[in-house]
Each structure stands twice: as structure tokens, then as C-alpha cells.
Regions:
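Acidic/polar surface patches and capping/hinge elements
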Residues: 1-9
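Glycine-rich loop/hinge motif
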Residues: 13
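Peptidyl-prolyl cis-trans isomerase
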Residues: 17-131
Length: 131
């Protein structure tokens, strides 16, 4: 039996102030090419982000597995990957489910208990699993 899922790589900038988050988002969105937007996000994350876990890695939050039915007892070995911030994880999963988030497009600001997140899905990989 096989199952399909996909993984996304997320980068973000975390700031304390919504106005700053809005300015960062606007700055990134003004770059016409996707690769340029990713580079700008990485540069701005290194300069402005207060996220100690991702700041020095261009805002990289790692890979998130999505599209897998969590109630399926045949879950992937090791469980499901999840973002450490539940508010951001919920936002990402809901946005992907509703198809409002897309690779290369800037999202946010997303408010969480840590502050305001501006981010982007930078890469995605579709997977087929044999169970």
C-alpha cells in the first residue's frame, strides 16, 4: 500500500513589532524573482530576526511534512515533523490545506506568542511512501 505526502522547507523572520514585519514583507515582495526573494529573506533574517534557532541559518526552520492523514495508524517512522511554534505550525498547515500558501510567495505577518513571523516556503518535495 502506498501513501502520498510532501515536504516543504520554510524560512522566516521573527520580529517583535507588526509594523517592522509589514516593512520586511514589503521589502521581500518587491523583489521580482523567486530566487531573489529567498536571498533577500535570508539576508534580512540574519540582520533583523530575533529567532535564535534560525537567525544564523537564513531563517531556516527546516522541513515540514504535510499532506499526510494524521489519523492513519500507519504514520511515518519517527512520527510527523512539526514546527516548534504551534501557532505558526497551525497557520502553515491550515494555509496549505486551504491552498492559500504557495512556494515562493511571502506570507505573514503571523502573530504568535514569540512575536510576528514573515516567511516563505522556499522548497517543496513530493513523496510517495510504500507502507
Amino acid at each position: 500500500m502506498a501513501g502520498a505526502t510532501h515536504q516543504i522547507q520554510i524560512r522566516h523572520i521573527l520580529v517583535e513589532n507588526k509594523e517592522v514585519a509589514d516593512l520586511l514583507k514589503e521589502t521581500i515582495e518587491n523583489i521580482p524573482a523567486e530566487a531573489g526573494r529567498v536571498k533577500m529573506l535570508m539576508k534580512l533574517a540574519g540582520k533583523y530576526s530575533i529567532c535564535s534557532a534560525s537567525k544564523d541559518d537564513g531563517g531556516n526552520l527546516g522541513w515540514l511534512e504535510v499532506g499526510w492523514n494524521k489519523s492513519d495508524p500507519r504514520q511515518p517512522r519517527g512520527g510527523f515533523s512539526k514546527l516548534n511554534n504551534d501557532d505558526l505550525d497551525d497557520f502553515m498547515r491550515e494555509g496549505l490545506e486551504k491552498m492559500t500558501l504557495h512556494k515562493g510567495r511571502v506570507f505573514g505577518p503571523v502573530e504568535s506568542y514569540e512575536g510576528f513571523h514573515v516567511g516563505m516556503i522556499c522548497q517543496e518535495v513530493k513523496l510517495d511512501r510504500i507502507l
